[in-house]
Amino acid sequence: RRDDGRRISSRVSSLAAFWPSLLLLAGSDVGEAQMTFRGYWEIFRRFGALPELFDLDSETAVHFGKDAPLRPELAESALHLYLRTNDGHYLVVGRELINALNDDSRVACGFAAVADVESKRLDDRMDSYFFAETLKYLFLLFDLSLEPQDRQSFFCCDETSIDRLNSTRGCAVDGRPCLSLSATLLSTEGHFFQMPSGRVSGAFGARMPLDAVAGPFECEASTTTTEKH
């Protein structure tokens, strides 16, 4: 909106659904992030998908923006809101996102983008960010909601690097997951960046107290083997 309260545009882009997570990372009030997320979630529930463009005045998907190409932004914001609030509502959100993917987008070779959110016609495409980001955020949302011993963290830190685990369960140290979101940043493309405790930015520290940021965790080596049947 403009300073006088008037709308700059009546159209809402699905790409902007990352905004609630950015507000939280910047240390903004959680209520503002929740309110913004609620608007996107209402649009999603109307169609069972988030169209690329939605018009607030007509309350319809814009005719050239009716597609929903499996974007990650809504799942990203749900993850950050859950981490901040521990509100089970965001787990329900994650469940509905997964159900929609399975009900509407699952095909023999993977998952297809929705070409039209009204007819649920599918497109012949599955962008790489679906695996790199969308599924990653959904995995973390539910993995971090579990008790530490039940988590399946797929990265584990030692003193010098981040290595893949052989174990399907992952490992935890002192009740903390190996992939600590208090010491790890996820880029807009879902890439992991390990943050040294002495270089945590002010914005990051506003979200997570500096004394909560630990150094890299050491995990015991895994010797799990898989039997073939």
List where the protein language model places each region.
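Glycan-recognition and catalytic cores of secretory/periplasmic carbohydrate-active enzymes
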Residues: 1-229
